């Protein structure tokens, strides 16, 4: 290797490091193991999009399931069925204040999955309490956990923090958020995000 090649390689390394801003970048690698998408989604009366038959988060979860070739488990509770938006907000706030853990239907065996996408709407700054019920029952420590959210201005809120608190030994990374009113035209955005994770 001549001196010009060495200098060129050194400059390339310097530029790539500068672009990272000195922050260690953590990339989620698809190891061809099966992934699981776990989510809670609320249909019915929703902020910004009105009364919808399919919840915003379910639409995103379906995109991920299709594009990543993943399996899917929906956290289903009927506690919020038929509720208008404002009463639901009030109930969600009260559940959060009390630390309630509403029950949900069914169960899932996560032992065969290395990667779990976990998503929901952002209610009062974090995931709905029924998702914390899932966190309390299902151990995802040792796995790669990828949070995603739908929202109307909260972004990821405290969801990533709360997933890390629930699973301190998981690799919580690769998070994604999207406005609820954008999800119906958001498949390309989800696909672009998944490509950054090698899916």
Residue ranges and their predicted role:
Residues 8-17:
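Bacterial N-terminal signal peptides
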Residues 19-115, 125, 132, 189-199:
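N-terminal beta1-alpha1-beta2 submodule of the flavodoxin-like/Rossmannoid cofactor-binding fold
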Residues 111, 136-142, 166-167:
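Short, conserved loop/helix-junction motifs that constitute active-site signature segments
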């Amino acid at each position: 290797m001549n001196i010009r090649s060495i200098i060129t390689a050194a400059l390339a390394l310097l530029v790539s490091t500068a672009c990272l801003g000195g922050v260690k970048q953590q990339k989620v690698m698809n190891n061809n193991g099966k992934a699981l998408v776990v989510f809670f989604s609320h249909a019915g009366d929703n902020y910004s999009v009105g009364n919808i038959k399919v919840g915003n988060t379910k639409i995103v979860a379906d995109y991920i399931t299709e594009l990543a070739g993943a399996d899917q488990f929906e956290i289903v509770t009927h506690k919020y069925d038929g509720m208008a938006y404002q009463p639901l907000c009030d109930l969600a706030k009260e559940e959060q204040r009390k630390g309630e853990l509403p029950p949900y239907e069914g169960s899932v065996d996560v032992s065969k999955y290395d990667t779990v996408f976990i998503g929901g709407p952002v209610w009062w700054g974090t995931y709905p309490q029924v998702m914390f019920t899932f966190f309390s029952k299902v151990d995802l420590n040792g796995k790669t956990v990828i949070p995603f959210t739908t929202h109307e201005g909260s972004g990821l809120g405290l969801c990533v923090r709360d997933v890390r608190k629930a699973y301190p030994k998981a690799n919580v990374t690769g998070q994604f958020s999207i406005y609820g009113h954008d999800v119906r035209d958001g498949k390309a955005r989800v696909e672009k995000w998944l490509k950054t994770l090698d899916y």
